[in-house]
Amino acid sequence: SKKIFLKKFFRYLFNFLFIIYLSLFCYFFFIFSNLSYLKIILYTVLFGCIASDIGGYVFGKIFKGPKITKISPNKTFSGALGSIIFTCLVVSSSLFFFTNNFSQLVIILSVIISLSCQIGDLFFSFLKRKAKIKDTGTFFPGHGGILDRMDGILLGIPFGLISIIILH
């Protein structure tokens, strides 16, 4: 039937586009990590993505509060705020350490990194819920699997790097 065809078509289209996105992500990550002057920027954005995930988890566990969405029921507003705060601390400290300079643009960059990581996390949580996958592993206790750790990074790094280009 037409409905089944469309469902399969969009599933294959999504998989195809995701493979292209992941390939481009890996390609640009490789390019950035091989250029020494861009390596600091790349790793600062990566540390910001990791900080976003950790800050959200820790603040959410400590302060709890209202839930953000049903897509990912453990996400709270306190976790979202903690994610932004911790990302700001890590990114500004990292850039100050490497450049001995601080700019207000670092705060804007940090907020963009954190929000894009949170959106990426929610987006992939939505996809996993649709596919009826709860966790993608237990490598990080309380954090889900490796893919759960990568959810935010897959959106955070590209948005972080694009933001640096625009803000610079």
How should each PLM-predicted stretch be described?
Residues 23-26, 156-161:
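Hydrophobic cores of alpha-helical transmembrane segments in multi-pass inner/ER membrane proteins
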